[in-house]
């Protein structure tokens, strides 16, 4: 029987934000598929330290012999409209959600170019495709990450490097629990105590995604099964953006 995700055995994958939620599921799924997975996450690897990213990547390449897959999964949220959001919070969100992925891509590209092959998967959000209230800067950061994916795909496709972007909807993770709790606390008239049910009812499948479902899509994009896919933004949201 052919493996579900061909071509991953023995490959080196870097996954950011790998200690919980979607990142942990991605780490586990790629490991189960035969990858040598290396994670970058707090406290050991603070992605706001942009000038250290290249050295982390180079150390992984020296240890494993290659960099074949990069999953830019780490991200932070912010809640608030434009008037409520200080510039310091804008800078924090853009640093983790856009600048760090940019620097990671810049660091892995020389290694991938040596082998004329590589797959980069960026984890955006359904907010890369649609707007949501009280989420202007987070949504803007994810839309920017999606467009970075498209441009990079055009630049580096001729050299054998693929770039794809996933756009998950609400996923059952600790981050989602924190976001829903804060929304209810700050805007109780808009987000009631049972707003989790409202979010689930807004999907065609009437539920949240599970982290493992997102991880399966990432493994597919990392593998040879998606060898003719690049520059895509793939919703995985239970039909939320189909409306």
Question: Where in this protein do the model-derived segments appear?
Answer:
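Active-site helix of classical SDR
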Residues: 105, 141, 149
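Short, small/polar-rich loop/turn modules that mediate ligand/substrate recognition or access, typified
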Residues: 157, 162, 229-231
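Short C-terminal tail/terminal secondary-structure segment
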Residues: 2-5, 130, 218-219, 230-243
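Alpha-helical segment proximal to the catalytic Tyr-Lys
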Residues: 110, 154-155, 227
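Conserved glycine-rich cofactor-binding loop
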Residues: 19
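Substrate-binding pocket helix/loop in short-chain dehydrogenase/reductase
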Residues: 81-82, 89-94, 199
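Residue(s) in the substrate-gating loop at a strand-loop-helix junction
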Residues: 125
